[in-house]
Swiss-Prot record:
Entry annotated with the keyword Hydrolase: no
Membrane protein topology class: Single-pass membrane protein
TM regions (residue ranges): 5-22
Name of this chain's protein: Cytochrome b5-like protein
Major site of localization recorded for this protein: membrane
Organism: Acanthamoeba polyphaga mimivirus (APMV)
Upper lineage: Viruses, Varidnaviria, Bamfordvirae, Nucleocytoviricota, Megaviricetes
Amino acid sequence: MTYNYLLILIIIYVIKIICRYFKQKNELQMESKTNLDSSKLVDPINQVNQINQVNQVNQTNQTDKIIVSFRGDKYDITDFLRKHPGGKNILIKNNGKDIEELMAEYEHSKNAYLILSKYKITEK
């Protein structure tokens, strides 16, 4: 009789473990569904356009020029390096890249966007 009792306890324990596993799995699935933010989804067409913009910028870059892309346009900001309040290194580091996310990440005044517009070298 004690053997049967022990066997029943083991079966109950295993069932609890299995139930806990499925409960945790379900909670993780629900959490991932609720955390899904459509604004974070990647738009494949937009991503291809950004890659093309970067490739175009890279093709036009010369070693002594700092050219960046912003909202589809290209800017030669070489002459602005010494004037940039955040230092020239961040501009050099982003040579040949799209800086739209970078501009949004660091707070810029309206004047900063006006200054950038003076360095535009191409239209969309």
